[in-house]
């Protein structure tokens, strides 16, 4: 089936690298700058790099926030990437503005007592806690690339689908509920493993986007 994919452009995103990755998968996308651009879109990607409060301010300036809330409440397909994952939650310790609140929980600073350098930059393996459209059945093959100083703590443990090691602790790597999900790492910068994740997501969309339990 033909898939109309929207990439949200709000001045905080790694748009070019995501676009190039999608091109390699033979999938085009439309940039979403305002609510009019949502017409005819089947699924959205919310990318992001930077800080929480400026990101929410930029999203509000586009007028997209109420439309994204309705999109999530209607359980339409949405994929957050990096900061895009954090914006799906209710609040962040990085700022004072509320997030979108499509997923319950809070974003907290990575633990300094872990002994690891912050920001966390580099490759890490995934530990699966459930299934979702991004993940393969072979967790050992999934090393992915992270750049972040904060991580989400979901209220509902069932929303956590994968974590990654940070020092002696595990931090959130993938969250998913229904058709709304996100990854803290950058799949578009995670070589073959990340590309295969996006390919699985696109296949899931084309096959009808069955909600994830």
Swiss-Prot record:
Enzyme Commission code(s) on record: 4.3.2.10, 3.5.1.2
GO MF, one annotated term: lyase activity
Subcellular location: Cytoplasm
Catalytic residues (positions): 82, 186, 188
CDD domains given in the database record: GATase1_IGP_Synthase (cd01748)
GO cellular component entries: cytoplasm
Pathway the protein takes part in: Amino-acid biosynthesis; L-histidine biosynthesis; L-histidine from 5-phospho-alpha-D-ribose 1-diphosphate: step 5/9
Chemical reaction(s) catalysed: 5-[(5-phospho-1-deoxy-D-ribulos-1-ylimino)methylamino]-1-(5-phospho-beta-D-ribosyl)imidazole-4-carboxamide + L-glutamine = D-erythro-1-(imidazol-4-yl)glycerol 3-phosphate + 5-amino-1-(5-phospho-beta-D-ribosyl)imidazole-4-carboxamide + L-glutamate + H(+); L-glutamine + H2O = L-glutamate + NH4(+)
Keyword entries, A-Z: Amino-acid biosynthesis, Cytoplasm, Glutamine amidotransferase, Histidine biosynthesis, Hydrolase, Lyase
Domain Glutamine amidotransferase type-1 stretches: 4-211
Annotated disulfide bonds: none
Assembly behavior: Heterodimer of HisH and HisF.
Name under which the protein is recorded: Imidazole glycerol phosphate synthase subunit HisH
């Amino acid at each position: 089936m033909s898939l109309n994919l929207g990439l949200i452009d709000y001045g905080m995103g790694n748009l070019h690298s995501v676009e190039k990755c999608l091109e390699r998968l033979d999938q085009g996308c439309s940039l979403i700058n305002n609510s009019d651009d949502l017409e005819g879109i089947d699924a959205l990607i919310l990318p992001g790099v930077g800080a929480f409060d400026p990101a929410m301010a930029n999203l509000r300036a586009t007028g997209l926030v109420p439309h994204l809330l309705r999109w999530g409440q209607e359980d339409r397909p949405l994929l957050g990437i990096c900061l895009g994952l954090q914006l799906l939650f209710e609040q962040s310790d990085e700022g004072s503005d509320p997030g979108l609140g499509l997923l319950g929980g809070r974003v907290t600073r990575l633990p300094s007592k872990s002994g690891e350098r912050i920001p966390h930059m580099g490759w890490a393996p995934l530990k699966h806690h459930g299934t979702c459209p991004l993940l393969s059945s072979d967790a050992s093959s999934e090393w992915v690339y992270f750049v972040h100083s904060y991580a989400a703590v979901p209220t509902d443990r069932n929303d956590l689908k994968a974590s990654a090691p940070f020092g002696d602790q595990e931090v959130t790597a993938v969250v998913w509920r229904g058709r709304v999900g996100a990854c803290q790492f950058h799949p578009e910068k995670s070589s073959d493993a990340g590309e295969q994740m996006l390919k699985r997501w696109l296949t899931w969309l084309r096959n009808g986007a069955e909600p994830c339990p």
